Amino acid sequence: MSWQAYVDDHLMCEIEGNHLSAAAIIGQDGSVWAQSANFPQFKSEEITGIMSDFHEPGTLAPTGLYIGGTKYMVIQGEPGAVIRGKKGPGGVTVKKTNQALIIGIYDEPMTPGQCNMIVERLGDYLIDQGY
């Protein structure tokens, strides 16, 4: 299965009638493995910041989590494994695998729990597969 198929079929899938707004699988080096058509153009320093928070949990909390220039307030995640961000009625979930970052961006009516489930389920599967 191609990386694009993982984004299209597993991240942008329907859950209880809702979809993520955008999603991507990004290498930990910042390279794009696959992304939805509307995933924001991100800066390499945004990925560097995310990786720093995975290595030293809490580093993003004071400044916020940025993806494509959009600032998300960091909310409770799983140190070293998942970073969650909130912005108004939407937010973002970032799951770290051995080699990549699975990123899901959502807006209402999708709930944070639905976004977390989609992103973390694929992340856990890829970890089990060695990625």
UniProtKB/Swiss-Prot annotation:
The keyword Cytoplasm applies. GO terms for molecular function: actin monomer binding. GO terms for cellular component: cell cortex; cytoskeleton. The modification Phosphothreonine is found at T111. Phosphorylated by MAP kinases. Gene3D superfamilies: Dynein light chain 2a, cytoplasmic. The keyword Translocase does not apply. Keywords: Actin-binding, Allergen, Cytoplasm, Cytoskeleton, Disulfide bond, Phosphoprotein. SUPFAM superfamilies: Profilin (actin-binding protein). Its main location: cytoplasm. Disulfide bonds join C13-C115. A motif (Involved in PIP2 interaction) lies at residues 81-97. It is found in: Cytoplasm, Cytoskeleton. Belongs to the profilin family. Binds to actin and affects the structure of the cytoskeleton. At high concentrations, profilin prevents the polymerization of actin, whereas it enhances it at low concentrations. By binding to PIP2, it inhibits the formation of IP3 and DG. Multimer. Occurs in many kinds of cells as a complex with monomeric actin in a 1:1 ratio. This is Profilin-2. The gene is PRO2.
